[in-house]
């Protein structure tokens, strides 16, 4: 081939400076045979014209034969069409050069090589062209096995065409196909071939339009009916990639279209059943739970105020009755919703396996409501018990307060404006309340509360020579509350001393007569005469005065 290329370059008048060792002899032969080259060129033009007609006729026959015999449309169109365009157009650049070179070859070589290459190319190119005329969607139409088989069948052929075109640049059918696309076909072969070229052009336009999403309009021809079907399926598959729903797809789209419908139907049916069961069960639960909750809460609200009102009363017998009434009602209220929720749970567990998670979420809510109800129902018991404990202590404190606040009617009353406390700081109640139980015993036996002035004078007469200690105090006075426990404790130590307590608010006249101006004030009497007096919350001074004056 290298020698032939040198000969062709010399025939054209091109100068080659570097040639192999055998090149001079061959160049001489070519120069001697210069006259023969012209004759061979003319004969070659005739032979090439005839070979073009034969090749094009064989191409048309094979294309018609291939299009009618194929029962199923070939699959891979887009890739082969693009591949055919890619392989043909590079040839278009080199084809004029190869054609001019081939005209100057020897007649024997041309007849042998062109006939062999044209036969091989006519057997190969119609297949590739027939394949290029059909649309392709390898991923969406037929199974992958057919697609890979077609690819494997096409690649060697196209690669052979490329290799042969690079080696010899002899392929006339490629030149003819290029010329047919450009409209350079000879007039003798233009008539029988024009119809087929129009069909192939239409099919190529259909494949390009199918890629753009346009429907092919070549369904009028009987031969193109299969192409229309494949183009429509290709359009549907391309539209499905863009987001449209495919109308006809064979493998993946049919599965994708069937499975979403099946899944949607199953999910909707299951969702409908689940939603109905869930709604019914939730409604039944809510109706069952709300009723006992309302009943129990109303009963609790009605019963708890009664128990609270009764607890304010000192008798404990009235507290136990509402407790007995409320506890059975609570037990009944708790048992009813628990049975209802258990039945509701049994109804829910009948649902399918797919709704297990929904059941778990649903069944948790009744348990939470039961726990909430139990917490609600338990809390009144605790509150009632706390009320019982609370109501016991107020009885004692109320009794003690009643006994403490009772003042004698005979005591001397004094004006409140004249009474002043000796200390502004008031003691805390925590320091006073621990002595309340002790105060009750002291008030009963040791400390006597004076109610009026007459009673006070009688006590002084009866005492005679005994020491009488009198505490002038008021309930609102903080230092008075602080000194009261100490005053009662000293009454237990000194049995030979009479301890009296005067409420300045009840005995104003007595306060005025005794000239009490500060609270608390302690006065000491013997033989109806005053022997000692001091004011203020002074515990040590009180003890010392009693010990000295006794």
Swiss-Prot record:
Report whether Phosphoprotein shows up as a keyword of the record: yes
**One GO cellular component term:** cytoplasm
Q: According to the UniProt entry, which residues carry Phosphoserine?
A: 42, 51, 158, 351, 379, 407
Q: Where is the composition biased (Polar residues)?
A: 73-87, 96-105, 112-140
Q: Where is this region: 22 X 15 AA approximate tandem repeat of Q-P-K-X-G-D-I-P-K-S-[PS]-E-[KE]-X-I?
A: 104-440
Question: Which spans of this chain does UniProt mark as sequence repeats?
Answer: 104-118, 119-133, 134-148, 149-163, 164-178, 179-193, 194-208, 209-223, 224-238, 239-252, 253-267, 268-282, 283-297, 298-312, 313-327, 328-342, 343-357, 358-384, 385-399, 400-412, 413-425, 426-440
Which cysteines pair up through disulfides? They are 477-480
Q: Where is the composition biased (Basic and acidic residues)?
A: 148-205, 217-259, 277-304, 313-348
Q: Any idea which UniProt keywords this protein has? A: Cytoplasm, Developmental protein, Differentiation, Disulfide bond, Phosphoprotein, Redox-active center, Repeat, Spermatogenesis
- List the residue ranges of the region (Disordered): 1-50, 63-428
Q: Does the keyword Manganese apply?
A: no
SUPFAM superfamilies this protein is in? Thioredoxin-like (SSF52833)
Which terms does the UniProt entry file under GO BP?
cell differentiation; cellular response to reactive oxygen species; flagellated sperm motility; spermatogenesis
Q: What does this protein do?
A: Probably plays a regulatory role in sperm development. May participate in regulation of fibrous sheath (FS) assembly by supporting the formation of disulfide bonds during sperm tail morphogenesis. May also be required to rectify incorrect disulfide pairing and generate suitable pairs between the FS constituents. Can reduce disulfide bonds in vitro in the presence of NADP and thioredoxin reductase.
**What is the name of this protein?**
Thioredoxin domain-containing protein 2
Taxonomy, top ranks, is: Eukaryota, Metazoa, Chordata, Craniata, Vertebrata
Q: Which gene encodes it?
A: Txndc2
């Amino acid at each position: 081939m290298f020698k032939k290329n040198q000969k062709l370059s010399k025939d054209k008048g091109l100068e080659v400076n570097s040639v192999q060792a055998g090149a001079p002899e061959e160049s001489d032969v070519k120069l001697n045979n210069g006259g023969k080259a012209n004759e061979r060129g003319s004969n070659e033009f005739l032979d090439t014209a005839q070979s073009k007609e034969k090749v094009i006729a064989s191409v048309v026959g094979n294309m018609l034969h291939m299009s009618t015999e194929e029962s199923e449309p070939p699959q891979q169109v887009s890739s082969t069409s693009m591949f055919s365009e890619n392989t043909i157009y590079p040839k278009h650049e080199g084809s004029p050069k190869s054609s001019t070179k081939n005209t100057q070859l020897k007649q024997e070589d041309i007849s042998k090589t062109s006939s062999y290459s044209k036969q091989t190319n006519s057997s190969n190119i119609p297949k590739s062209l027939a394949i290029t005329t059909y649309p392709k969607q390898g991923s969406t139409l037929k199974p992958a096995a057919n697609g890979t088989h077609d690819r494997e069948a096409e690649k060697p052929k196209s690669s052979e065409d490329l290799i042969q075109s690079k080696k010899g640049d002899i392929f006339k059918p490629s030149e003819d196909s290029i010329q047919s696309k450009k409209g350079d076909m000879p007039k003798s072969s233009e008539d029988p071939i024009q119809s087929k070229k129009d069909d192939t052009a239409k099919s190529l336009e259909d494949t390009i339009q199918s890629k753009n999403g346009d429907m092919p309009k070549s369904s009028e021809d009987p031969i193109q009916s299969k192409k229309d079907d494949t183009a429509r399926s290709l359009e549907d598959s391309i539209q499905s990639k863009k987001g449209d729903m495919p109308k006809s797809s064979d493998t993946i789209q049919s599965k994708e279209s069937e499975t979403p419908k099946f899944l949607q139907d199953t999910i909707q049916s299951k969702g409908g059943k689940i939603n109905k069961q869930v709604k019914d069960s939730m409604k039944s639960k809510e109706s069952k739970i709300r009723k006992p909750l309302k009943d129990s809460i109303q009963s609790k609200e009605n019963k708890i105020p009664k128990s609270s009102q009764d607890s304010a009363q000192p008798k404990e017998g009235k507290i136990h009755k509402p407790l007995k009434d409320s506890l059975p009602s609570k037990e009944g209220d708790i048992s009813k919703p628990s049975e209802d929720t258990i039945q509701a749970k049994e109804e829910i567990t009948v649902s399918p396996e797919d709704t297990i998670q929904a059941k778990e979420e649903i069944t948790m809510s009744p348990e939470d409501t039961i726990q909430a109800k139990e917490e609600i129902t338990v809390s009144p018991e605790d509150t009632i018990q706390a009320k019982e404990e609370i109501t016991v202590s107020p009885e004692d404190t109320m009794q003690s307060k009643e006994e403490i606040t009772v003042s004698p009617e005979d005591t001397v009353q004094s004006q409140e404006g004249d009474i002043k406390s000796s200390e502004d700081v008031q003691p805390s109640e925590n320091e006073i309340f621990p002595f309340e139980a002790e105060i009750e015993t002291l008030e009963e036996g040791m400390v006597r509360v004076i109610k009026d002035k007459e009673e006070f004078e009688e006590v002084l007469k009866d005492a005679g020579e005994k020491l009488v200690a009198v505490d002038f105090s008021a309930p609102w006075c903080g230092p008075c509350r602080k000194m009261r426990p100490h005053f009662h404790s000293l009454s237990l130590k000194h049995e030979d001393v009479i301890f009296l307590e005067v409420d300045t608010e009840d005995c104003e006249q007595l306060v005025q007569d005794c000239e009490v101006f500060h609270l608390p004030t302690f006065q000491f009497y013997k033989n109806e005469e005053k022997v000692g007096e001091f004011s203020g919350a002074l515990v040590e001074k009180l003890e010392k005065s009693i010990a000295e004056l006794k």
